[in-house]
Amino acid sequence: MNSLYIAGEWLAGQGEAFQSLNPVTQQVLWSGEGATAAQVESAVQAARQAFPGWARRTLEDRISVLEAFAAALKNHADELARTIGEETGKPLWEAATEVTSMVNKIAISVQSYRERTGEKSGPLGDATAVLRHKPHGVVAVFGPYNFPGHLPNGHIVPALLAGNSVLFKPSELTPKVAELTVKCWIEAGLPAGVLNLLQGARETGIALAANPGIDGLFFTGSSRTGNHLHQQFAGRPDKILALEMGGNNPLVVDQVADIDAAVYTIIQSAFISAGQRCTCARRLLVPEGAWGDSLLKRLVEVSSTIEVGAFDQQPAPFMGSVVSLGAAKALMDAQAHLLANGAVSLLAMTQPQAQSALLTPGIVDVTAVADRSDEELFGPLLQVIRYADFAAAIAEANDTAFGLAAGLLSDSEERYQQFWLESRAGIVNWNKQLTGAASSAPFGGVGASGNHRASAYYAADYCAYPVASLETPSLVLPAALTPGVKMA
C-alpha cells in the first residue's frame, strides 16, 4: 500500500508494517508500512527544495490554497467525520464537530497571521522602522490520536500560511484520518513537496526528530514523548520547538446553589471524549462535609446513566471508546493500582466487553492515598480529593508539575479572582467546563504541559520569526558626524 506522500507522489513505506483498528470491533481500517530513516531524509530534501518557491509566493496566493483546502474539507466532511469516528471511537456527532473546527481554523489562522505576524512600519529619525516576519523553513508536525484532524491541522495551517514547508508525522493509531486530510490538501492544489506525509510509529518519529535538515518541530501529544523531544533539542537554539502536552487538571467545586449544574459541568469536564482531551478534569476537589457528600452522590447517580457506545450507534452515545485495547487495559490497571493503595471506588470504571475498548465512567476517591502519582490518566477515570478549606483546595490544585487547565465552580466572584490569581495554569475557567476552549484564544499551559501556545490563534507566533529593519532608499552622509570620526 502506498502509505507515504513525498515530493508529490504516493509511495509505499519500507519500514515496519502496522494497522489501525476500530477500537470497538477491532476491524482493520488501514494497513501499510512506516517510513524508514532513508525515506524521512528523502521527504526532508523534498520539503527543502519546495520551501523557497512556497515562501516566495504572495500571502494572498498562500491564502487561496488554504481556502481551497477548507472547501475540500467541506466537500469530504461526512467521509472525514466517519473516518475520525472509526479510528478514534468518538461518536459521530463529536467527530463532525472536529471537522467543523478544521474548516474554521483557516479563517482564524489568516486573521492571526495578519494581526500577529504581518508587516508593520513607522518613522524612526530619517529612516523607516519595519517589522516583518519570515518562515523558519522546513518544520515537522507530530500529531496526536485524540483529535487526529483538528490538532495537527492547528500546526499545519499556520505553518503553511507563514511560508514553511511541512513534514507531517501523524499518530500511528490514526493513519487513515491523516491520509484523507492530506488528500484534501492535494485537492486544494498545494504544490508538491510543500506538505509530506510520513506514516509510522516510534522509529519513524525518532528519525524525523533527529534529522538535521529540519528547522523546527511542532508537537501535540503525551508529556513523556514531549519531554524526550525537549531533551533531544537541548543545546539546539537554531531549531524552534513548540510543545503542547497534557495535564493533571484540577476542577475545584465550591459550595454552589445548583448541584445539578455542577454535576453536569463536571461530567462535561471529565468524561467528554471518553476523557481523552488534554484539558479534561483529572482531579475533582470537593469540600469535606455533608454538602460535598451530596454532590458526589448526585454525580455518581448521573454518571452511572451516561450512554457509552460505538461511534455510529443510534441513538448517539455521549461517550465512545478509548482509542485502543492497550489504552483500555492501562486505564483499568491504573484504577486497580489506586484501589490497592487505599483509594475508594465511588463508581467503578468497567470494560463491558473484553475485546472492545469501551469503558464506562469511573469515579474514585483518592483522598486517603498517601503517595498520589502526578500523572495524566488519559481516559474516563476521575479522581476525587476532599478538601478542608479553600486555601487547601488551591494548594492541592497547584500540587502538580503540569499546568494546562484549572477550573472553579463557585457562586463567589471573589473566590474566583483569588483562584485565578493563585492558579498555575495556562487555561483557568470559572463555572464553565474545563474542556471548553475558543480557537481565538491561546491554548496551552506551563510547566510539564508545554511551552508555546500551540494549535490556536497564537500559533502564528512560533510559525514565523520577526525581522526588524531600519530602511531608507538613499545612502546619505549625516550632517553631524559621531565624535572622533573625521571625513575631511
From Swiss-Prot:
Keywords: Arginine metabolism, NAD, Oxidoreductase
GO BP field: arginine catabolic process to glutamate; arginine catabolic process to succinate
Keyword Oxidoreductase: yes
Enzyme Commission identifier(s): 1.2.1.71
Residues annotated for NAD(+) binding in this entry: 221-226
Molecular function terms from GO: succinylglutamate-semialdehyde dehydrogenase activity
CDD domains attached to this UniProt entry: ALDH_SGSD_AstD
Pathway: Amino-acid degradation; L-arginine degradation via AST pathway; L-glutamate and succinate from L-arginine: step 4/5
Transmembrane portions of the chain: none
Active-site residues from the entry: 244, 278
Family: Belongs to the aldehyde dehydrogenase family. AstD subfamily.
A Pfam family recorded for this sequence: Aldedh
Keyword field contains Oxidoreductase: yes
Protein name, UniProt field: N-succinylglutamate 5-semialdehyde dehydrogenase
Entries under InterPro entries matching the protein: Ald_DH/histidinol_DH, Ald_DH_C, Ald_DH_CS_CYS, Ald_DH_CS_GLU, Ald_DH_N, Aldehyde_DH_dom, SuccinylGlu_semiald_DH_AstD
Main enzyme class: oxidoreductase
